[in-house]
Design a protein with these regions (language model features):
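Periplasmic OmpA-like peptidoglycan-binding domain that tethers envelope proteins to the cell wall
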Residues: 72, 78-96, 100-104, 114-193
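Juxtamembrane linker/hinge segments adjacent to a transmembrane helix in small membrane proteins
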Residues: 1-75
Length: 193
């Protein structure tokens, strides 16, 4: 009876007897991924149009995945070196970004801060992780406190130098790695977080 119980358990979980997903589950996941990508691409088009209208599309890189739309903003525009306070240019850019994404305020939104690999050790920021946490939180605070975004559907976190998108051995690569990413999850994935 234990084998029957195990077989029943696997079937209820959408798994075959080898513990692998059944073809039905795989097909459903592929379909959900396609629908998610289609929705994210539509969101990305709307956001990009709004950023173009605000004449800031050259300051934000937009990527659509099957789960979310990611806005990548260069940290050099947002912050002075070694600081987490928003620059006046950052406030202007975030005003435009907020206008472009506010329609998705009910969706789950994450804000991630990233740094290059150059070590920092100040009284305020003992390492890059703390700097990235504070930078992400500065963007979060601005959007929640100044632009009316819902704190219940938005989070901020820092990743330090742990998720580079370019080579940290060059000045250009380090500049690309200093960034803040805003991820707006599509409707299919907003409730899953």
């Amino acid at each position: 009876t234990q084998l029957n119980d195990l077989s029943s358990y696997y079937n209820n979980m959408g798994l075959n007897t080898d513990g692998e997903f059944t073809e039905e589950v795989k097909t459903a996941k592929e379909q959900m991924d396609k629908e998610g990508l289609k929705e994210s691409e539509s969101m990305a088009d709307e956001i990009e149009s709004a950023l173009k209208a605000a004449n800031v599309d050259n300051q934000v890189e937009i990527t659509a995945t099957n789960k979310y739309v990611m806005l990548n903003m260069n940290g050099g525009i947002l912050f002075n070196s070694g600081e987490a306070d928003l620059t006046p240019e950052a406030v202007s850019l975030l005003d435009s970004v907020a206008g472009a994404i506010y329609q998705y305020n009910d969706n789950y939104i994450t804000i991630e801060g990233h740094t290059d690999s150059n070590p920092i050790n100040t009284a305020k920021f003992p390492d890059n992780m703390m700097l990235s946490v504070h930078r992400a939180h500065s963007v979060y605070n601005y959007l929640v406190n100044n632009k009316g975004f819902d704190a219940k559907t938005m989070t901020s976190s820092g990743r330090g130098e742990n998720v580079p998108i370019a080579d940290n051995t060059t000045a250009e690569g380090r500049a690309q790695n200093r960034r803040v990413e805003i991820k707006i999850y599509n409707n299919l994935n907003s409730d899953i977080q």
